[in-house]
Curated annotation (Swiss-Prot):
Note on cofactor: Binds 1 Ca(2+) ion.
Record's function text: PLA2 catalyzes the calcium-dependent hydrolysis of the 2-acyl groups in 3-sn-phosphoglycerides.
S-S pairs: 26-115, 28-44, 43-95, 49-121, 50-88, 57-81, 75-86
Pfam families reported for this sequence: Phospholip_A2_1
Cofactor(s) in the UniProt record: Ca(2+)
GO molecular function per UniProt: calcium ion binding; calcium-dependent phospholipase A2 activity; phospholipid binding
Homology family: Belongs to the phospholipase A2 family. Group II subfamily. D49 sub-subfamily.
Organism, scientific name: Eristicophis macmahoni (Leaf-nosed viper)
Secreted listed as a keyword: yes
Gene Ontology cellular component annotations, sorted alphabetically: extracellular region
Protein name: Acidic phospholipase A2 PLA-2
Amino-acid positions noted as binding Ca(2+) in the UniProt annotation, renumbered to this chain: 27, 29, 31, 48
One of the GO BP terms on file: arachidonate secretion
Alphabetical UniProt keywords: Calcium, Disulfide bond, Hydrolase, Lipid degradation, Lipid metabolism, Metal-binding, Secreted
Amino acid sequence: NLYQFGEMISKKTGTFGLFSYVYYGCYCGLGGKGKPLDATDRCCFVHDCCYGRVNGCNPKLSIYSYSFQNGDIVCGDEEDCLRDVCECDRVAAICFGENMNTYNKKYVLYSFKECNESDQC
């Protein structure tokens, strides 16, 4: 769920998790359209696409099991849908951590009107 995703982000970036990314660029937060503005926004685009492929549960509300082991996020071995959601969140959190150098404060609260020409998943 979103709380768990926020914990993963915090662990991988040292930031305040979702609060640092919830209104970033064209894809971080609810919905999304346009071309990702940078590598950080692309992490959100890929995450949105991943959620779009999940079947059988609501990715934003589903509670899954995971742990942190030696700095790595490890998803539990539960039913397919929950494991898929966890993997989407895990990959995105790692992506944010790997692309912190592209995070640009000018893309926080970015105007959705500027987001055009959508990419395809």
